[in-house]
Amino acid sequence: MHTAAQFSISTLNNLYEISSVEVGQHFYWQIGSFEVHAQVLITSWIVIAILLSLAVLATRDLQTIPTSGQNFVEYVLEFIRDLTRTQIGEEEYRPWVPFIGTMFLFIFVSNWSGALLPWRVLELPHGELAAPTNDINTTVALALLTSVAYFYAGLHKRGLNYFGKYIQPTPVLLPINILEDFTKPLSLSFRLFGNILADELVVAVLISLVPLVVPIPMMFLGLFTSAIQALIFATLAAAYIGESMEGHH
């Protein structure tokens, strides 16, 4: 009976710890009458600083015969270029390589920062820090950038004829075609946000149950999932841009 009671108490304690795992507490700056979402700004600036630092280090001493570090950077650039060319097409892809590359690298580093950097160790007066993509504001902003990009691409390539796609194959589908242009990138943002948030919550729950062993495989799985989510977002963003210039679904 004593052992059973101890087991029950231990189980209740574990359940209490799990119930205390929160979706996230945000850190805000109060500037006048405006409440600024500081958590996203701080972590986004850190991610941008990491990317800029890596870019400076990678291009500081370029060699005709590339070193191992230069080889890696060239491989990443070639990967992004091939991804963009595959989705947009041989003739139109070059101007869009920087945009797709920026999207991919920002999301990739943001996702990995959530898995590798101990954001929550940094104590704040209130709230907590987390990966930028762990916040719906960031992923929706990326979705809106994608929307602006493919609207611009379609109008730049096809002019006012771009709007003709909304009444194809029949004008009856006009509302659905308009709605589709906004739901496609938003679905990307919700998928990215949901996957990153779920990964962090699963790791937090497992750490509360088995602090040492079990979370490690989940963290490696989280790194893999984070990379896949960055690839999916960049690939579909490029596909939407290519689709807008081609003028068909």
Curated annotation (Swiss-Prot):
The entry describes its oligomerization and partners as: F-type ATPases have 2 components, CF(1) - the catalytic core - and CF(0) - the membrane proton channel. CF(1) has five subunits: alpha(3), beta(3), gamma(1), delta(1), epsilon(1). CF(0) has four main subunits: a, b, b' and c.
Question: What is the protein name stated in its UniProt record?
Answer: ATP synthase subunit a, chloroplastic
Where is it found, in Gene Ontology cellular component terms? chloroplast thylakoid membrane; plasma membrane; proton-transporting ATP synthase complex
Q: Which InterPro entries match?
A: ATP_syn_F0_a_bact/chloroplast (IPR045082), ATP_synth_F0_asu (IPR000568), ATP_synth_F0_asu_AS (IPR023011), F0_ATP_A_sf (IPR035908)
Going by the UniProt record, its keywords in alphabetical order are:
ATP synthesis, CF(0), Chloroplast, Hydrogen ion transport, Ion transport, Membrane, Plastid, Thylakoid, Transmembrane, Transmembrane helix, Transport
Organism of origin is: Physcomitrium patens
Q: What is the lineage of its organism?
A: Eukaryota, Viridiplantae, Streptophyta, Embryophyta, Bryophyta
Q: Where in the cell is it found?
A: Plastid, Chloroplast thylakoid membrane
Q: Which residues cross the membrane?
A: 38-58, 97-117, 136-156, 201-221, 222-242
Q: Which family does it belong to?
A: Belongs to the ATPase A chain family.
- The reply to whether Transmembrane helix figures as a keyword in the UniProt entry is yes
Give the record's membrane topology: Multi-pass membrane protein
* GO MF annotation: an example: proton-transporting ATP synthase activity, rotational mechanism
Superkingdom, natural source: Eukaryota
Q: Does the keyword Transmembrane apply?
A: yes
- Describe the function of this protein: Key component of the proton channel; it plays a direct role in the translocation of protons across the membrane.
